[in-house]
Amino acid sequence: MVKIINTAELDQLSLSADENHWVYNGLDNCVTLEIYNELNATIDETARRTYEFSKALQAPVLEMNMRGVLINQNRRRAVIKAFEAKTRILEAQLMTILSGVFDLRDFNWASPKQCKNLLYEVMQLPVQKKRNARGIYAPSTDREALEKLSFYYIAEPVINHILGLRDLGKSLGFLRTPLDSDGRMRTSFSIAGTKTGRWSSSASDIGDGTNLQNITESLRSIFVADPGYKFANMDLEQGDSRGVGALCWNLFCDEDEAFAGSYLNACESGDLHTTVTKMVQPDLPWGTAPDKAIAETIFYRGQSYRQAAKKLGHGSNYLGKPAHMAKQSKFPAADVIRFQEQYFGAFPCIPKWHKNVRWRLENLAFLESPFGRRRFFFGRPNDGATHREAVAHVPQSMTGDAINTGILNLWRANRVQLLIQVHDSILFQFPQEQEDEIVPWALEALKAPLVLAHDRPFVIPTEAKTGWNWGNAGADNPDGLVKWKGSDPRKQTETKFRLGLL
């Protein structure tokens, strides 16, 4: 016989432990359904499309969360060993400096307290303050504070060592992340993790694994395809930039197509970020080699001039101020000011778009992307922070919706195994003997075409790389990813025995 429990007249103390759980689960389902029914009646077609799209993504996300990625445990041990050796070298060098100059014999670089004592008491450097987790304005030794102090000649070698050791410590922490019993690392992707529609990721649903969306290039080679499979990493090219161009076109093409299309035309005509590099660094030896090769010259902490210039372009698109952008890009502030004058002179539609966003905030309080994703903004419309957030929102949401539309296409076709989404890229694996067929098909499947105003077609192009591990190929990583140019004649050098899988 079924026991009926009327929760409206329930004496909770009269229930057994099992009955308490039953009531809790029943309320959890019934109340949620009642709320859904009320909310569902209020959803318009714009919101419903976004809701249905998010629901459709649950299946590929669950599959990716469950599958995880195989780890080359031999490679992982080798990378850990190399990073530990680098750590010992930097620690020894740092202690030589501290003992010789400051007669300091014991120092733990990982201790914020000891770092504050060294920098602000022993070295007497200007105290850098910011609000801590408790909201108190207090001395800080975070990266931003240390990079400000590194401009002092006496502090530069000490701070460079501390920053280098912190980077190594963070990398070692990731490399030592426990694996599951099948030798795989997993994450938990969240479809609703951000306001833009981009995914976030964190530890897996059972508490292990980690965020796999911020893994640096130096660590990626430990991720390998399953035996008999090969990786493809497909990356949207200039996604946010082309989104900015599409918005400018839609807003202003009725007034002047040349004005409205100046930025989108530049995006579609070639390598935008190399063009930006030439604008900000005119004194590089342009003409002595291909422009992109010169732009890829290393500039700061493994970052190329092109990567730094890319930050300037994005920062300028998103209302970045010269002083802040100089810190982020490591270009002198005077160069950033000169760059922005040239940049906005070449693409005057961008500052006009910025003004349009402010008008929409003040008069409508919402923005809607060409993909149909709408967001309301509840901050003060005349506040700078709200304006900056709104300016960045639609281009970033367009990139997220474009890659996720492609991911859904790949999953529905059931020809590849999805692994890791990194905001504007997707890593998947496929039977390696099918490469010449799968890669061209996947490039087409990842397209999310739109038709802009005046019937202008718009699609964010995709670059493909293939290989047997997630790192870029090189002398020390022959099985890494290489740009796909119609075929890949390489043969895998590491077997499953060498991978440490058996």
What are these regions (language model features)?
Residues 11, 62-66, 112, 126, ...:
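Conserved catalytic core of nucleic-acid polymerases
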Residues 28, 240, 269, 273, ...:
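Hydrophobic (often cysteine-bearing) scaffold residues that line and stabilize catalytic clefts
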Residues 120, 243-246, 472-477:
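Short acidic, glycine/serine/threonine-rich loops at helix termini
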Residues 188-296:
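Function-dense linear segments that define catalytic or interfacial modules
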Residues 448-461:
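Flexible helix-coil linker/hinge segments at domain or subdomain boundaries
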